[in-house]
Amino acid sequence: MIKAQKLVDSYPISFLLSLAFCLRIYNIQSPILGVHSWRQADTAAMARNFYENGYNFFYPQIDWGGNLAGYCQTEFPIYSFSVAILYKFFGVHESIGRLLSIIFSLIAIYFFYKLCLEITCDKKLAFWSSFFYTIIPTNIYYSRTFQPESLVLMSAISGTYFFYKWIKNDHKKYLFISSLLICLACLVKVVPAFYLFLPFTYLVWQKFKYKMFSNLNLYLYTAIIIIPTFAWYFHSYQVANEYRLSFGFSAEKLGWNFQGLGIMFEQIVYFIAVRHLLVVGFIIMIFGIFCRRENKEEIFFDMLFISNILYIIVFANIHSSHEYYQLFFLITASVYMGKVFTRNRYSTKIINVIIVVFLLTGSLFYSLEYMTKENPNNSELFELAQIIKQTVPKNSLIIATTGNDPTILYLSDRKGWIPSPNAINQTYLLDRFKDGAKYLVGGYNFVQAYQSSMEEKDKKKIREVVSRSSNSILNSENFFLIKL
């Protein structure tokens, strides 16, 4: 035990990165299933379409465009494009996308440790903060999924580190590197601009005071971030107008849903306190917020925390829908958790008990909530995808009743439409048949990957449609597949 502790003290980053890699590499070969498979399926589909249809970076393609080319308004597709390039050398394997996410997450952990150490000058705090950031179950999961979250976090954290280095050393190379990294983060997900503005402004004010308004380097820094970001999203908006396909960058997703305000914020608290921090971690974080600050530089993390809270409140609608929008919140949460273990006089025994409870709770939660749902042997959706692969010709367009969830299209390597079951009627089927649809497919026991059963009225209606068809290929207790 003593030797192990000395090893951790001597090589903290090596220990953290090794631990992070081991936690994330498990089940890397899993197909696109489970929690938020719909988001992963879109990202994976873009990568596969880049690989199969030519590397047209400015026009990413999805699978649910029906008889259209599938050009879609998306975030900056550098992640999918990078995976597609790797496909050229290694073939199409989901594990490549997952491995790329893991690599980005390891870089993020490295710079998170360096940032904590740079700001606090406390090696022990930097380690404990990074340790909790490494083992939080949701952070483990989303840093090995087939989506660009780990790229955004890596870019934002490393960009923040280099910005802080510039503040302290005044070397322009740090500012330039930071501008490129923050620009990349904003291109992929524009939200870093919201939660980094306040802490960056705090750092600049501490250094320059009113002279910040006449600092040309800061204007150039801002321009490097804003101009490419605006250019991409303007282009993406034009794609949406021309091809009528979008990931849903709309005003309806912003702000508040006043009719369900209580439920909305209750869901956000549930995401943060229960799913992210497992209650135990949330309590530790609350204690950490009130721990002393050793220097004024540490206020940076308080500014980042406040910025995150404001961002969550202002954009509460999207935060109540998807848990991965709070991933950046885990940075400050981890710092506060780390402070509890370094700035309070708790006995080693108490610390060990808390860590064991957190690890056991996290392991159980991660296994039951995430890993079991990635098991194809437990998935009717995956089973149906294999039936489609074997039954439906490769280039035939299908209608899948998965309610805007493209997972079935990706897993079956088919293209088509993904309406909700309640949209299915003879008029809809006739219109899609005229558009080139050849098959209607679906499952009676699931709609979206996150909706485990179809409503009885929709199930009854679809059974009637299937029973009237003279070209029914499959109509079992679980699945239906008919030729139109």
Go through each PLM region and give its residues.
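Membrane-interface transmembrane helices that cradle and orient dolichyl/undecaprenyl
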Residues: 117-124, 159-175, 185, 341
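Short periplasmic/luminal acceptor-recognition loop of GT-C membrane glycosyltransferases, typified by
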Residues: 196-197, 378, 389-433, 437-448
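Transmembrane alpha-helical segments
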Residues: 192, 340-376
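Transmembrane-helix motifs of polytopic, lipid-linked glycan transferases
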Residues: 96-120, 158-162
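Extracytosolic helix-loop segments that constitute the early lumenal/periplasmic catalytic or substrate-binding loops
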Residues: 25-29, 42-71, 78
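Transmembrane-lumen/periplasm boundary regions of multi-pass, lipid-linked membrane glycan transferases
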Residues: 42-53, 184, 195-299, 308-323, ...
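Short helix- or helix-capping micro-motifs
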Residues: 20-21, 129-134, 182, 186, ...
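Short acidic/glycine- and proline-prone juxtamembrane loop motifs at membrane-interface regions
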Residues: 141-151
